[in-house]
Amino acid sequence: MNHLMFYCRPGFEKDMAAEIQDKAVALECFGFSRVADNCGFVLFECYGEQDAERLARRLPFRELIFARQMLVVIEQLNGLDLKDRITPIVEAVQKMPQFGELRVETADTNEAKELSTFCRKFSVPLRQALRAAGKLTPDVDPRRPVLHLFFLKNDSVWIGYSYPNNNSPFHMGIPRLRFPSDAPSRSTLKLEEAFYMFIPPEDDEIRLCSGLTAVDLGASPGGWTYQLVRRGMMVSAIDNGPMAESLMESGQVKHIMADGFTYRPTKKNPYWLVCDMVEKPARITHLIAQWFREGCCQEAIFNLKLPMKKRYAEVEHNLAVLKEWLAEIDGEYVIQAKQLYHDREEITVHVYDERKLARRRSGAFN
């Protein structure tokens, strides 16, 4: 088979299909998507032989906005004997190189979630059988491809593989984050996931550390402010609404009752700007660009709400506009975007200046 499979948020299949069509054409790999509403995945069938393999290697997974996972399809098995599913699966991968990890997964839908327990239990005997057949390393080996079993029903499975240097490291492409009991709102998980997604661990001590200052636009009740405070930052929380008392008691938060679109810091020393305001994407994009153009921040994470039908087109337009505006400023600006697991009808965008970051990494913090 010459297919790629992409996991995505249910309801965003058409956006995922539009994105992969654009990206594949840019790499001169042509094909078409098979899409079903609210199924949680998209199949992209390539016309050219070996194009699926080429895309899996050349298309940077981190640059895909709507994809939770990307894998090359080996085979689809239907009508599996419920008394012996393992034998045909092992036979299907006999001609493949040895794999370094096994993930037995399903779609992130209410219907498919009923298979979660089965997938977890089935992975144990399947892992043993694959190792006995020499198709899976004794321990997880990050140098080898990951074998994916994607079950639609308990007798129907897609078999595929991904490359560890170009995939999501998470089961089903979903990071497992626990909601902190003292956080003011569940939105806190959006920013925590964004930090995990966009900031490499080796940079935590210079980009997510105490001593930095941050501004949270539209902060109330403080879900995003909470993530900044727990990392030791001093935060200006901008919102006419109330802030959680627990955050105010930390001594790290200054609550400024003002409009998030008109507020600017009196001292242009904030490192972080974060924003989760409910507003049209174009207006948020313009606001973020203004902050960078006025030198009011060095890094930003913000959400673009997507209630419209053509969401991928809206995202691409706003990111292109932001890129144009940032190109007018001295710097080497990087824009990253992802629909995170904890996002809903929205995506999260990260912007930073590579030059300034390089200076921070070298120890020059100005």
UniProtKB/Swiss-Prot annotation:
SUPFAM superfamilies: S-adenosyl-L-methionine-dependent methyltransferases. The active site is at K305 (proton acceptor). GO terms for molecular function: S-adenosylmethionine-dependent methyltransferase activity. The keyword Cell inner membrane does not apply. GO terms for biological process: methylation; rRNA processing. S-adenosyl-L-methionine binds at S187, S220, P221, G222, G223, D239, D259, D276. InterPro entries: RlmM_FDX, RlmM_THUMP-like, RNA_MeTrfase_FtsJ_dom, rRNA_MeTrfase_M, SAM-dependent_MTases_sf. This is Ribosomal RNA large subunit methyltransferase M. It catalyses: cytidine(2498) in 23S rRNA + S-adenosyl-L-methionine = 2'-O-methylcytidine(2498) in 23S rRNA + S-adenosyl-L-homocysteine + H(+). It is found in: Cytoplasm. It comes from Tolumonas auensis (strain DSM 9187 / NBRC 110442 / TA 4). GO terms for cellular component: cytoplasm. Belongs to the class I-like SAM-binding methyltransferase superfamily. RNA methyltransferase RlmE family. RlmM subfamily. It is an enzyme of class 2 (transferase).
